[in-house]
């Protein structure tokens, strides 16, 4: 589930102090005085990788990689097989912390607030994580049951599933088994799975 985070740390109950940041899913607010002031994140987050270095057994996989991505934009990283694209993706999503370097989301460190930001990052892997024997809609409903907060009822989950099916032009394939979809349709279903929770950042390997 998304959980509630105070200054990047998951909490159940905590007394707030002036200036604290509290996040629930993609919603973030700042505690000022006796009130919570919502922070405007509808414009998306800026994203920057700074001097990312990854080495294994003295073999350099990533060497001083830096780049920035503007909010609400699309960036493609291309290269031949073995160039380090998946290694970079693992580093900039926090799946593997690099030897050195930093990733900033807005003005905050991904690695210092990993538990919080992991709920706001969608990652579509090379290999689909879908249950091939399930129908498309059922596979997404199952994914929603695992990813949504426990207090989300069945009707709310079903509504969100229908929304992403429509957004990705999969409504007519809702009752078709995953293993009967075309390759492109399966990949769109994998994207739909990640979009269920409306992540602020979406990565595709």
Regions found by a protein language model. Name each.
Residues 5-57:
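C-terminal boundary/linker segments immediately following FHA domains
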Residues 47, 62-64, 118:
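Conserved structural motif at the start of ABC-family nucleotide-binding domains
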Residues 78-81:
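The feature captures the beta-strand-to-loop junction immediately N-terminal to the Walker
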Residues 93:
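Helix-to-loop junction immediately C-terminal to a conserved catalytic motif
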Residues 101-109, 117:
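Conserved ABC transporter NBD signature motif
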Residues 132-149:
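Q-loop/switch helix immediately C-terminal to the Walker
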Residues 141, 145, 156-173:
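Conserved ABC ATPase "signature" region
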Residues 194-195:
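ABC ATPase C-loop
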